């Protein structure tokens, strides 16, 4: 939207190279296949493709550039410290169920504020917003997470995340009556990934039912 990059511009996938954990401040990568920015966005969001995500991160100027944008956008409680190759290589340094590591973190509130701003068009043009939300609607990872227990007529645009002993799913639930619910669920521990997925799905359904119940109650009150 700033005119610096176009969706048709091509950038190389950033392929991680073998290296020992914590052996370097930044994990080594090599350039791979050239892809358009739009293709990289599609891979990054729909399939949580790490080389595609790192390609986009490099194209916009790295973690520092992303942090500057977040500050300008008024988003606190969210920070990026490493590229994905380094984050994944060094994953497991801390157990997220018992230790809070503030690096590369976002509070659920900050994530919901980002999602709400994206949905409301606070920062992006309609066309750019459509690209991101469209990719989120086509997400193929996390089918057992946010969407799993929702009614079939509820549409979900979401993005998953998975690291050692932690799973997440964040997105926007669109209800049949046209409302949008921004939701961010992070789960640690729980005895394994299937249990974490189930917990995310259950929370998603509870939030969905809660909003629908509240809406029905307000309509009944207004009709009296």
Model-derived segments and their meaning:
Residues 1-18, 125-128:
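Short, well-structured active-site flanking segments
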Residues 11, 15-17, 84, 185-187, ...:
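A mature extracytoplasmic/lumenal domain signature
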Residues 15-27, 134-145:
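Short, mixed-charge aromatic SLiMs
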Residues 20-23, 73, 82, 177-179, ...:
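Conserved catalytic core of the tyrosine transesterase superfamily
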Residues 21-22, 33, 41, 54-115:
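Mid-domain, small-residue-enriched loop/turn segments at the edges of structured enzyme/sensor domains
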Residues 28-35:
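A charged helix-plus-loop insertion that forms the helical arch/lid used to bind
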Residues 58-59, 63, 112-224:
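Structured C-terminal helix/loop/strand segments within mature extracytoplasmic catalytic/sensor domains
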